[in-house]
A protein has these predicted regions:
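Non-heme Fe(II) oxygenase catalytic core, chiefly the N-lobe of the double-stranded beta-helix
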Residues: 1-123
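Catalytic core of Fe(II)/2-oxoglutarate
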Residues: 59-62, 129-203
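Short, well-ordered alpha-helical scaffold segments within catalytic/effector domains
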Residues: 124-128
Length: 203
């Protein structure tokens, strides 16, 4: 993948079902990923999943893609007000701050990039939190689908685009990469572009 940046890589040894976690940390609640380890500035979050459990499926659910979630819940989540190009394109001082943190990261302080943020990433984080915490979203079933991944399967997802939750399953590997938006063939479908070109969600 051209110019992609490696993100996190983790092993998931625990059973996903029945964990007592705060909503913001619960993977069994449907959500869209936002930049948890620094700003993406609209670049895509691509994740690879490998299921290692030899006997038990890994069960996922979804409520649809970002354009659908945005159209249905964007106003309730507080990300539709003032949406448009100015809502997601950073100003000059924000761009300077990003370059400073990137320089520190290149100089051997990789955790400096975690401090980075952007207008786009703040809106995506707001939507992520809304999906996990708001009763009006959590109680909904619109667009709900369920998937079962059998033992020894692998799959890849743009997790900023496809809403998802892991309902059950144990033993999996997860690798994350950040793919430049400029390298995407269907750029117009990316959340960064949708937030600019579709500022008013459909009720």
């Amino acid at each position: 993948m051209k110019d992609c940046r490696p993100g996190t890589c983790s092993f998931r040894p625990l059973q996903a079902a029945g964990r007592k976690l705060k909503p913001c940390a619960a993977d069994d609640l449907v959500h869209l990923d936002a930049g948890a380890y620094g700003a993406t500035h609209g670049d895509r979050i691509l994740r690879f999943f490998v299921k290692l459990n030899p006997s038990e499926p890994r069960v996922w659910s979804t409520r649809g893609t970002f354009p659908r979630i945005y159209a249905r819940y964007g106003r309730q989540a507080g990300i539709a007000e003032g949406a448009g190009r100015a809502a997601v394109v950073d100003g000059p001082f924000e761009r300077i701050w990003t370059r400073v943190l990137a320089t520190l990261g290149d100089a051997g302080l990789p955790k400096a990039t975690i401090l980075d943020s952007s207008r786009y990433d703040r809106r995506m984080r707001r939507l992520h939190n809304f999906m996990k915490e708001a009763p009006e979203f959590r109680s909904g079933v619109d667009g709900l689908e369920r998937f079962e991944f059998p033992p020894y399967t692998a799959w890849t997802v743009l997790t900023d685009m496809v809403s998802h939750a892991c309902l059950s399953g144990q033993y999996a590997l997860v690798s994350t990469f950040i793919v430049p938006l400029a390298n995407c063939r269907l750029r117009r479908l990316a959340p960064y572009e949708v937030l600019q070109t579709q500022p008013e969600p459909v009720a």
